[in-house]
Design a protein with these regions (language model features):
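Active-site neighborhood of phospho(di)ester-bond hydrolases with catalytic His/Asp-centered motifs
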Residues: 4-13, 41, 120-125, 142-144, ...
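Generic structural signal for residues in well-ordered beta-strands
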Residues: 62-65, 84, 204
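Active-site metal-binding motif and surrounding structural segment of the metallo-beta-lactamase
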Residues: 1-39, 67-69
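Binuclear metal-dependent phosphoesterase catalytic core
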Residues: 207-219
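Hydrophobic packing residues within well-ordered alpha-helices of enzyme cores
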Residues: 20-23, 48-51, 131, 197
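Short, well-ordered alpha-helices that flank and scaffold nucleotide-derived cofactor binding pockets
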Residues: 25, 53, 168
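Metal-dependent phosphodiesterase/nuclease catalytic metal-binding core
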Residues: 69-181, 189-200, 216-221
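Active-site neighborhood of divalent metal-dependent phosphoester bond hydrolases
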Residues: 32-69, 186
Length: 221
């Protein structure tokens, strides 16, 4: 937990942001001193300041809010091994997806030794034209699938996706794997959602709590 340096928040609906404040408090109690960078939509700043003023006593480390405002995929964070890009989603409020691109060391000619792997996180979103294009060639996509296609109209009205729509994005993007998540609680059995997606994009699985999804290391160039 203490190794966390960067946190990404897609949007400010409660199911995507409330949990962070317990984490911030825990890091403070554990004696964190290193700055923590949080990438989030504009209004997170006022929420953070409220929390710091009322509940942040004893939190000695710096919390840096980086405003997300991308209109198309753009790099927001770089580490030695990964570039993180943000891009806008379609959810009725400021909402962002994230694209992770692996970086490999360069050879003597200045070229990457391997092709970097990639993964995309698409949280709450209704369909929009640019999504598949922005994710072209990605290895793995996590995509929300709140509803089945039988509830297509409700999905659109609430700025969400169906399992079929998520699978269509993966197919059009040329992805290798699709992980579905963010299911409506109305579904006690998720098998129909999985089957709906696999009819369009066979390499689909359902997200699991603490699940791990392997992206194979590519051959050397």
């Amino acid at each position: 937990m203490m190794k966390i340096d960067n946190i990404l928040i897609s949007h400010l609906h409660g199911d995507h942001v409330f949990g962070i404040f317990g984490l911030l408090s825990t890091l403070g109690m554990l004696g964190r001193t290193a700055p923590l960078h949080i990438y989030a939509p504009r209004d997170f700043s006022s929420i953070l300041h409220f929390w710091q003023g009322h509940f942040g006593e004893g939190v000695a480390y710096e919390i840096v809010h980086h405003l997300l405002s991308a209109k198309a995929p753009e790099v927001i964070c770089e580490t030695r091994t990964v570039d993180v890009l943000a891009f806008p989603l379609n959810h009725g409020i400021d909402t962002f997806g994230f694209l992770f691109r692996e970086k490999w060391p360069l050879d003597r000619a200045g070229n990457p030794m391997r092709l970097g792997r990639s993964a995309a996180y698409c949280s709450d979103t209704a369909p929009f034209p640019e999504e598949s294009e922005w994710l072209k060639g990605v290895d793995l996509i996590y995509h929300e699938a709140t509803y089945g296609e039988e509830m297509h109209d409700k999905a659109i009205a609430r700025y969400h996706s169906t399992a079929a729509r998520a699978a269509t994005v993966a197919r059009e993007a040329g992805a290798k794997q699709l992980v579905l998540g963010h299911f409506s609680s109305r579904y006690k059995d998720l098998t129909p959602l999985l089957e709906e997606a696999r009819a369009i994009f066979p390499e689909t699985v359902l997200a699991q709590e603490s699940g791990r999804y392997v992206i194979p290391i590519p051959e050397r160039l």
